[in-house]
Amino acid sequence: MMFKNFPFFKGKKDTSFDHLVEEVKKGYIPEHIAIIMDGNGRWAKRRAMPRIAGHHEGMQVVKKITKFASKLNVKVLTLYAFSTENWKRPKKEVDYLMKLPEEFLGTFLPELIEENVQVRVIGQQDRLPTHTRRAMEKAMEETKENTGLILNFALNYGSRDEIVSAVQHMMKDREEGKVRVEDVSEEMLSSYLMTSSLPDPELLIRTSGELRISNFMLWQIAYSEFWFTDVYWPDFTEEHLLNAITDFQHRGRRFGGV
């Protein structure tokens, strides 16, 4: 049975998946979902395939999950695509990862435009290869007027780096007399982050069974709900995302209260 491993779907054997989707949509849908897409390499290794095969398969899942998140009326979907630490990986793998945005957007951009999806990128883009930057810039330019789901790629992104950069810019504004020490607040610091125009993630998902944050949106996930799964990213499905959201809907978010 499709939903046997999904606790909130138990007892609904005669219910279609589409009906379950509509039931979940009656509840509160997180405005911003962030996903640490982990496990591509291990997925490939288990199948005696090269690691890049796992990344290619993971790209197909991005397409599927983006469409489904849009269907659920999620406002922002942030995907951790490449961290500042990932440069330590073998050059062949890094080179392939830098080609993925071109491949992904080359085939999927028309559908993103049709789905009214807006593409954005956070991260230090100056270190990215020119062909990678151009692919992302083209997608952002061609979707900038779209008003549906914001598909936000974290590419060459590290949260500590982001926070340091934000503080540096704030100090520069202080030197220029634009900021006073007494004006500094959480809201002000947030305004200097790469996500300043976005709501903080309400739900953080990590695949592959790892229980860590990996330098991802450390400031922004202060009050996020976490959802971990042992499933590798290439095996992640719409059912998994629906289950994560259903779990989210059953939690009591107190934000430090009682």
From Swiss-Prot:
Binds 2 magnesium ions per subunit. PROSITE patterns: UPP_SYNTHASE (PS01066). The active site is at residues 38, 86. Signal peptide: none annotated. InterPro entries: UPP_synth-like (IPR001441), UPP_synth-like_CS (IPR018520), UPP_synth-like_sf (IPR036424). GO terms for cellular component: cytosol. Its EC number is 2.5.1.-. GO terms for biological process: polyprenol biosynthetic process. SUPFAM superfamilies: Undecaprenyl diphosphate synthase. Homodimer. NCBIfam families: PRK14830.1, uppS. This is Isoprenyl transferase.
